[in-house]
């Protein structure tokens, strides 16, 4: 909800001079725009007078098309000009200033300021008279720009062959990156110089169930960069609607990135009808890494909430029948008796169960009991529905119906049992990437959820996309993801999409999108493990676009203790797993481990039970990509605070509690790595201490590599609470 009025100044001028300059409201950033001698739009970006993006070209390359006319006979005019990147002239410019404050339904802050200066450049191509606008918005912490195509007779339709947006770097920066891929983002991050990307990619990439690379120098956004003189730069996009996701392809000779849009099955990057626009391209810049994490540019470049009523959207903390399957203890499937499943024909009541099915009524009730005993909101159940026996690897269209439970999953009994305990069930819709099939059953699937009062669904898109040849992040498939979110809103259902395109801030417009995976999540700790600094990179990259359903909370790091046949290791300390609930903010948070593992460490589990999901304030206290992150957040509607620190390397954290209310004493419970903690050899070594703090207190704590700490802070309401506690 917006609660401050727009403060706008609009200046219209017929542009006689080609060169234009735009400053951020605080004058720290400067954008320069001009046309080259060939009429190619060009921009550059400066931070405190220092060049961040060298002169970079803008434009679109089209597929050649034929103009077809029907008359006495069909005629074709061939060779339509494919260039939308040169021979332009400026016909008009418009400057605007906006300063507003709006309230998200949920998020890291209760109030978000949207303050920018805007330059709109209207262009016309001299030979074709086609029109294209470039809209630049300069915030105090970065730049957003996009292409806009007014409705016009000269170009009512067009097909994009490639977007030619450039980001020309000033030097061989340090980068935190994952390989460019049309089908997966589930990679460990690399840290290297830009010039080293090619060699690292050529050594091979981690295998995944669906992956399609396109270049040895291709990378995905959000891309995190750091210059040798300490400037932090983040490249991403915002408001990805009706378009393919943007990758970046590096010319490692010139150090120029060019946008590389995910194509469809025919190689097209976008089918457009005017009026149309691209997503925003974003450049966040600061000499302080904390500002990258605190930036609201991605959200501010998205449209306001499109839902008239959001009262049904609530953050959820949940447990689930999931880690048992991920670790290999249980299975999603019900039987080994069928070589293949025919949805609607296979009679499961005649088949022998293999005895390893996880989603049984009896097992689910145990999780419901655990959730109720510990104050959780919901229980996720995967593998409840028929079809898992041959769900993957067969390019199968009719793979699930999203309605029919296995014989040992009594959906009505579970509904009634959960309701009696005050627990909401979370639905699971694995699509096996058969998108047409999911849309075929979507209404009935959502109606089933309404019938049994499921408020949220976890959807999955594992494997190669059907229609065959499509990519996970192409225009058509991205439109499907948004269709599913909009359709879910019609049924008052919240969506947590896994394997979908990485977020670009659309949760502002559709706040029922409460979670995404779209990166290498916690499950990979049971698939061989992730790098110990992975969670210190994700907030600088994947989380720039929106929250992640990372599934933290693993307490048993030795996966073989759960399943003797799985020798994976969770590369984190127990204190690190607690901290993730704060450092990787999300309105949807899972306690992913088994109930029995939490019962072994009830004192540490207390933090997971208490930590909030929705915030009124967030203060980033310390940050360096891949090395450490420390953040303090205030729980919305309370006076309580939570602090989290994750460390990718040995790190001594030094924080000041100046964010606390003045003249107020807080009881701080500190969950930290023990002195002998080690993420490989002694991950469950932690300490818990209680102290009294005020806004004048300071704290120094050591976190080991792969470790961290978590703190809960509650105002002192009774002097008895302070008995025996030291002041910090």
Report each predicted region and the residues it spans.
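Catalytic domains of carbohydrate-active enzymes, especially glycoside hydrolases
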Residues: 362-384, 449-455
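Catalytic cores of secreted or luminal carbohydrate-active enzymes
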Residues: 575-622, 710-712
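N-terminal accessory beta-strand-rich subdomains and adjacent acidic, glycine-rich linkers
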Residues: 21-308, 685
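C-terminal beta-strand-rich structural cap/linker in extracellular carbohydrate-active enzymes
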Residues: 690-727
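An acidic-aromatic substrate-binding cleft motif
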Residues: 273-366, 374, 378
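Aromatic- and carboxylate-enriched substrate-binding clefts and catalytic-loop regions
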Residues: 382-569, 573
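Bacterial Sec-dependent N-terminal signal peptides
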Residues: 1-21
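Carbohydrate-binding surface patches
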Residues: 624-666, 709-712
């Amino acid at each position: 909800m917006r609660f401050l009025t727009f403060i706008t100044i609009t200046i219209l001028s017929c542009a006689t001079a080609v060169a234009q300059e735009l400053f951020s409201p605080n004058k720290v950033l400067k954008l320069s725009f001009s046309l080259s001698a060939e009429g190619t739009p060009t921009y550059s970006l400066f931070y405190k007078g220092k060049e961040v993006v060298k002169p970079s070209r803008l434009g679109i390359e089209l597929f050649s098309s034929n103009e077809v006319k029907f008359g006495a006979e069909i005629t074709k005019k061939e060779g339509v000009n494919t260039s939308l990147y040169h021979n332009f002239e400026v016909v008009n410019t418009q400057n605007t200033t906006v300063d507003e404050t709006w309230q998200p339904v949920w998020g890291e802050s209760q109030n978000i300021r949207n303050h920018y200066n805007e330059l709109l450049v209207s262009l016309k191509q001299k030979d074709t008279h086609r029109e294209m606008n470039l809209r630049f918005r300069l915030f105090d912490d970065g730049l957003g720009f996009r292409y806009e195509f007014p409705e016009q007779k000269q170009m009512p339709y067009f097909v994009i062959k490639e977007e030619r947006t450039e980001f020309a770097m000033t030097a061989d920066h340090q980068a935190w990156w994952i390989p460019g891929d049309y089908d997966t983002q589930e990679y460990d991050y690399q840290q290297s110089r830009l010039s080293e990307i090619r060699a690292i990619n050529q050594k091979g990439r981690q295998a995944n169930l669906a992956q399609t690379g396109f270049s040895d120098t291709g990378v995905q956004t959000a891309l995190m960069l750091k210059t040798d003189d300490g400037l932090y730069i983040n490249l991403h996009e915002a408001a990805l609607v009706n378009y393919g996701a943007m990758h970046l392809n590096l010319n490692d000779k010139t150090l120029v990135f060019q946008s590389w849009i995910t194509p469809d099955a025919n190689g097209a990057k976008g089918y457009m009808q005017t009026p149309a626009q691209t997503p925003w391209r974003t450049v966040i810049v600061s000499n302080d890494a904390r500002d990258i994490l605190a930036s609201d540019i991605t959200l501010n470049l998205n449209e306001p909430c499109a839902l008239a009523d959001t009262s049904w959207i609530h953050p959820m903390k949940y447990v689930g029948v999931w880690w048992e399957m991920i670790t290999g203890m249980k299975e999603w499937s019900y039987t080994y008796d069928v070589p293949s499943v025919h949805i609607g024909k296979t009679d499961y009541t005649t088949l022998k169960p293999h005895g390893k099915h996880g989603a049984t009524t009896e097992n689910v009730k145990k999780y419901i009991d655990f959730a109720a005993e510990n104050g959780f909101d919901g229980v996720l159940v995967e593998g409840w529905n028929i079809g898992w026996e041959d769900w993957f690897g067969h390019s199968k269209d009719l793979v699930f119906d999203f309605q029919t439970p296995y014989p040992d999953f009594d959906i009505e009994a579970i509904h009634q049992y959960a309701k009696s305990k005050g627990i909401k069930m979370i639905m699971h819709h694995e699509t096996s990437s058969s998108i047409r099939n999911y849309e075929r059953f979507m209404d009935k699937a959502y109606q089933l959820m309404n019938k049994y009062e499921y408020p949220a669904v976890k959807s999955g898109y594992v494997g190669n996309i059907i229609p065959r040849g499509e990519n996970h992040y192409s225009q058509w498939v991205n439109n499907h993801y948004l269709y599913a979110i909009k359709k879910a809103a019609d049924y008052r259902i919240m969506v947590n999409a896994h394997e979908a395109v990485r977020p670009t801030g659309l949760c502002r417009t559709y706040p029922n999108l409460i979670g995404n995976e779209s990166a290498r999540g916690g499950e990979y700790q049971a698939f061989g493990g992730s790098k110990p600094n992975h969670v210190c990179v994700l907030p600088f990259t994947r989380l720039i676009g929106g929250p992640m359903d990372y599934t933290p909370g693993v307490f048993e790091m030795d996966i073989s203790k759960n399943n003797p046949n799985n020798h994976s290791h969770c590369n984190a300390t127990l204190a690190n797993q607690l901290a993730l609930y704060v450092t990787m903010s999300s309105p949807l948070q899972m306690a992913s481990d088994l109930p029995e593992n939490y019962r072994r460490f009830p004192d540490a589990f207390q933090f997971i039970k208490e930590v909030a999901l929705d915030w009124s304030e967030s203060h980033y206290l310390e940050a360096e990509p891949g090395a450490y992150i420390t953040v303090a957040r205030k729980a919305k509607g309370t006076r309580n605070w939570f602090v989290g620190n994750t460390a990718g390397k040995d790190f001594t954290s030094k924080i000041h509690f100046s964010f606390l209310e003045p003249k107020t004493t807080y009881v701080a419970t500190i969950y930290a790595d023990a002195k002998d903690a080690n993420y490989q050899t002694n991950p469950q070594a932690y300490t818990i201490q209680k102290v009294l703090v005020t806004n004048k207190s300071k704290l120094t704590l050591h976190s080991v590599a792969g470790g961290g700490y978590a703190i809960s802070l509650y105002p002192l309401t009774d002097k008895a609470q302070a008995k025996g506690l030291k002041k910090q």
